From Swiss-Prot:
Chain positions recorded as a divalent metal cation 2 binding sites: D72, D114, H244, H300
Protein name: Metallophosphoesterase 1
Chief site of localization: endoplasmic reticulum
Pfam family, one: Metallophos
Top-level EC class: hydrolase
Cofactor(s) of this protein: Mn(2+)
Upper lineage: Eukaryota, Metazoa, Chordata, Craniata, Vertebrata
Membrane found in the keyword field: yes
General function of this protein: Metallophosphoesterase that catalyzes the removal of a side-chain ethanolamine-phosphate (EtNP) from the second mannose of the GPI-anchor protein intermediate. Participates in the glycan remodeling steps of GPI-anchor maturation to allow an efficient transport of GPI-anchor proteins from the endoplasmic reticulum to the Golgi.
Listed EC numbers: 3.1.-.-
Gene3D superfamilies in UniProt: 3.60.21.10
GO BP term (any one): GPI anchor biosynthetic process
Oligomeric and partner information: Interacts with GPI-anchor proteins (via the GPI portion). Interacts with TMED10.
GO cellular component entries: endoplasmic reticulum exit site; endoplasmic reticulum-Golgi intermediate compartment membrane; Golgi apparatus; nucleoplasm
Amino acid sequence: MALVRWRLRRGNFHLLSRVLLLKLTVVIISVLLFCEYFIYHLVIFQCHWPEVKTLAHGDRQKPVLKAMFLADTHLLGEIRGHWLDKLRREWQMERAFQTALWWLQPEVIFILGDIFDEGKWSTTEAWADDVQRFRKIFRHGSHVQLKVVIGNHDIGFHYQMSKYRIKRFEKVFSSERLFSWKGVNFVMVNSVAMEGDGCSICSEAEAELREISRKLNCSREVQGSSQCEGEQRLPFSAPVLLQHYPLYRASDANCSGEDAAPPEERNVPFEEKYDVLSREASQKLLWWLQPRLVLSGHTHSACEVLHPGGVPEVSVPSFSWRNRNNPSFIMGSLTSKDYALSKCYLPFEDRVLATYGAAAVFLVVLILAHLERLPSSFLFGWKLRKMHMRG
């Protein structure tokens, strides 16, 4: 009789073990799917394109261009990039980017520099590997255009940059500086070359910008017809200036918001030509291009600044968890005359980690709850075995 009872309890033990294993598997898979996939849909689904005025132009309304702006992706390289850090950060950016494409369907995407973390010193082989990973993470359909601006981590600071690194970057991402679509002009500046010291790279970059300025002036019909004769006219629209370094500002003291720099860092003075462009370079860009809007990266934090002449600048926070807990990107609805911007936050890293922590606690409680139901089966079997051994 005792042996029958022991066999029943042993069968019950195996059943409880299988039930526990099934529950653990379901919980673990559910948490992984939520934290690594569904959470991106849940968060980005709540983002919406801002509305912009579409004033009638004759019998037609002005077309609206939907543009996404993100910055400082900092794909890790072979020197400073631990494999686990790479895996975690790049998966986060890939899921965020692909989910944003799915829900928001932008027409053009701009990345405002520091695409890579080690472009300034990477070897040819390491560069090729970084580019391959970039193309996988930021893959997109042919109906979407992706434009990239040079950052200091892509080619090095002014004293590190070389024509070789610039050509290597432009071979992959194009050397285009002026881009027009749906009546909206974008000027993409290599802000690393705005040192103003007369170096050959800097002189070429400034000459390019002066030529773009001339073309923009022709579209405004500022210059005489002789200077613009035979020129293919750009859309009559003040440009949007895109660059990595922000225009000159003393610090982030006037920046606010949950994704601005931490309070203890906001009053730290910025260094010209390192944290921001110099006063002189900033004045040149504003004078030459007369932009209606400036978007920049580099600081990894958000800020909105109003420059002389009423020109607004938006500093776009980093897109990567590696640089901040609450990454985001900017959504812009633009016409040739007007624009509207809104911000779309990505999942916060600490909340994802908290979800994993809560799941781990739940698993421990679940295991302990099942173990409390098992000792009687073990004890009964142990006693029965001892009785047989004595017999």
